[in-house]
Amino acid sequence: TEITCHAMGAVWIFDNKDMTIIDIGGQDTKIICVEQGFVKDFMMNDKCSAGTGRFLEIMANTLSMRPNEMCELAREGSGVTISSMCTVFAESEVISLIGQGEKKENIAFAVVDSIVRKVAAQANRMSEDRSMLCLTGGLCECSYISEALTKELGMEVKTDPQSRYAGAI
C-alpha cells in the first residue's frame, strides 16, 4: 500500500526502524508510526486539502507567488493567523487580509502556520511517544515548514534531500 511504501522509504532514507513519519503531500497528509521497521498505525487526512501542498499552492496563487516563495517569505512574517481550516474559507481570509493591506510576509506566515498547526495536531493525536520524527512528501523541501513543525512539536523534525521521494523508493 501507499502507507507501507512511505514507511519503507523513510526507514531506508533515515536508516532508523522506529519513527513517526509526517508525510505532507499534494492531496493528503499522513502520519505513520513505524516500529521495528513495520507500520504500527497511521492516520490520513484525505477528506479536504487543508494542511496539504494543494492548500499551500492555492494560497500562493492568491498572493501571485510560487509555493516555495511563500514558504521562504513566511520566515519574515508574524502576527497574523488564519482561523479557518477549510481551503475555501481560508482563501477568503487571505483575500480579506490583502484587502486590508496586510504585508505579504505576514499572510505567508499565517498560511504556513495554519498548515503547521493542523499537521502538528494530527501528529499529536497519532502518537506522543516518539523516538524520531521525519518529514516526507513535497513540502519537506520547504525548510521553514520542518523548522516550524520542530518548534510546534517540541522535537526535531528531520528531513533529507531524498525525503520527497520516500513513497517511491
Language model features: what each stretch is:
Residues 1-22, 37, 120, 124, ...:
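Conserved phosphate-binding catalytic cores of ATP/NTP-utilizing and phosphoryl-transfer enzymes
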Residues 90-125, 164-165:
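Adenine-nucleotide phosphate-binding core of ATP-dependent small-molecule kinases
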Residues 38-82, 86:
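Glycine-rich phosphate-binding loop plus the immediately following alpha-helix
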Residues 7-13, 53-57, 158-169:
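Glycine-rich phosphate-binding/hydrolytic loop that grips phosphoryl groups
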Residues 1-7, 147-157:
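N-terminal glycine/serine-rich phosphate-binding loop of ATP-dependent small-molecule kinases
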Residues 123, 128-152, 162-166:
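Glycine-rich phosphate-binding loops at beta-strand->alpha-helix junctions
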Residues 23-28, 137-139:
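A short acidic Gly-Thr/Ser loop motif
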Residues 29-34:
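Short beta-strand scaffold segments in enzyme catalytic cores
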